[in-house]
Amino acid sequence: MTPRSFRLCAGALGLALASLCPVAQAGDYHDASLPVDERVEDLLARMTVDEKIGQLTQRLIDVGMEKDMEKFFSVIRTGSVGAYILMLEDAQYRNAMQKTAIEETRLGIPLLFGADVIHGHRTVFPLPLGLACTWDPDLVEQAQTIAAREARSMGLNWTFAPMCDLARDSRWGRVAETFGEDPYLNSLYVAASVRGFQGTNPADPGRVVACLKHFAGYSASVGGRDYNHTEIPPFIFRNFHLPPFHAGVNAGALTVMSSFNANDGIPAAADHWLLTDLLRGEWGFKGFVVSDWEGVQEVVDWGYAPDDVGAAIASLTAGNDMEMMSKTFTLLGPKIADGTLPISVVDEAVRRVLRVKFLSGIFEQPYTDPEAYAKTILAPESVALARAAVARSVVLLKNEPFLNTPPTGTPSPTPGTVPQNPSASTPAPTATPKPTPKQRAILPIASDVKRIALIGPFGDEKREMIGCWISQGKAKDVVTLATALKSRVGADGDVKIVQGCDINGSQPRTKTLTDGTVVLDKSVAPPMGVFDLPAAVRAAGESDLVIMALGEPWSWTGENASRARITLTGRQQELFDTIAAVGKPVVVVLFSGRPLALPSIFAKASAVIAAWQPGIQAGPGLVDILFGDVNPSGRLTITWPADTGQLPIYYNRYNTGRPDKGFIDYRDMSREPMFPFGYGLTYTSFSYGKAEVIPAANGKPAQIRTTITNTGDREGTEVAQLYVRQFFCPEGARPYQELRGFQRIKLRPGEKKEVTFDVTDEVLGYVGRDGKWRVDAGKFSLWIAPQANSGDPVSFTRP
């Protein structure tokens, strides 16, 4: 479609026609030298009720809708929309819509254009759960800076990110979009994301307005089912689910998205305590709140409002300023006229929206250079960072020698760790085992390995690599593992690529028994797809090493993608079991948006890598790890369950009144995870010395310190993690371990480094029931460890 020709309001068309064309009014709100609040008040005073409601309304323009742009122009001219969800990659459409808003409405208020820019725009990075496993907020800030630059060059000025929700139940599909399960670590990533998106000034070129979502408690949906209700008590709410949002507000985020859930029976979009008392009253948030998709109208479905008008009044009064997609706010005119809804409530919501529009700079810079996008996306430095992010986000879960002996029994959870209960005996420090020369771990791939079989449906699959919520990401930009592997091995080696099976498999036609007759349900497709065991077995038998690329489909992650069983899909498990029996070393690379409970794979494979959904540089980043060009340093930010039945599972649980193992285990399995929070292997090994606490002195806080030594034979990065436990809390029980600090430490072979953490009130405190930060006197345990559930606690008493 070619851009429409804009009508001229003067000249050849005549003064008569000019008088019919709306012209933006000159006024103080156009003066960029004035304080933002003065501009807001001047503009607000000029607006009609209909224009005000229009600013509180967001609509969608998606791919394909550009065929009828006049429909959008007509709506914009009425002033009945203030923002759009924009999915069109061509800036000409966005500029045309913006020009209509500015030149063909009475007040010329520009539009906000938002989209879900979650883990990259065109340059797609690992999903947020993967990025979090880098334990590097600076890297996340860099990635979001690139995403913002690319998005702004397309015409977006607002992203619905970052997600601040905790990931405590891997059945929930949106675990993929989170930064993990820990409120402290998530807070760091949320703040880093806000800085990456908005910079120091969201009006600067290449910046977009950030949006903290989903406010709040959305991820605690009962049963891990998306959109379900939540049951979060206030004390837990304040100390676990709310801190990442608070960190985002403190970092300067300009918008917040209310969530789909209803906590304690009150839908978030209509929760006055959440959106007004807490967000604005306690935290001082000055931006605006937008609902999630049709979230205001869903207040009726929850049963919290009798009809759409009631939902609109309840949500707007609660502090939900903008309505995404549903149209209940358009029904408010009569209720404003008869005084049911005070105009002051509407004015306050509009005031917040206008303030963000002024701060974002779109009054001064409303348009986008149509040529900027092509010059900005997929820049070499952006792609290079995407590759580095892959290598740093993958987590090496297992890496053992290949002994060619069949495994017996089931794998023990958490290999290489010592389960810890600070109330019981003190465990020994944890050290990553170092293989003997005769039992070299299978990774990195040895130089004498020339014949490699890459088996599995993810090996040469492009779309699966970029995952869910990809904004403008394209499969054509992806370099697959197969491509990168063949490039790395070159002519001197042999790489056999065998799909083996489909990702999802296929569902056979169902058979039912009716009156003694078997009836074939023809509405279900017959068995189809790929399942070629002979080819896979043959390739494995002819190779020195097998790499199996397995996982879950990207469409089974993200929104509305809950799972009852977090296992491999289709016939992948059968494929793995068959190949594992061939008698060759097997390295499994898992592609997923969540941890998967795969006990037989962890038992039989020599090595396992969690690759997540790695982005466009999936192949090169993984090859860097497989061949040892990069020593893995990723650490889990989510507990990896041994079985779906353990969910929800998270490291910072409570001690219970009966902490002895006999009272907290299941009858049929251990409560211990397969891998704990903070876990991850490297190609070297580290040891931790005995920790000690240095008392406070001379105005300096107390400190805890230890010495970490690289006991391996190559340089590596360790993530030293500080954990704390408070033994007595008058406000309520506290978790038996909480992360309160970490340091990434790079060490050469044999090198030692002293690691020190300050023991401040920020480390020891928590949010009290009154919403204020509280630090109690009394006994604490502190320890520095490579992961949760391990380490050597040191007693500390705060006077």
Label each PLM-derived region with a short phrase.
Residues A10-L20:
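Bacterial N-terminal signal peptides
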Residues M1-A12:
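Bacterial N-terminal signal peptides that target proteins for export
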Residues W773-R774:
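Surface-exposed, short loops/turns at beta-strand junctions within beta-sandwich domains
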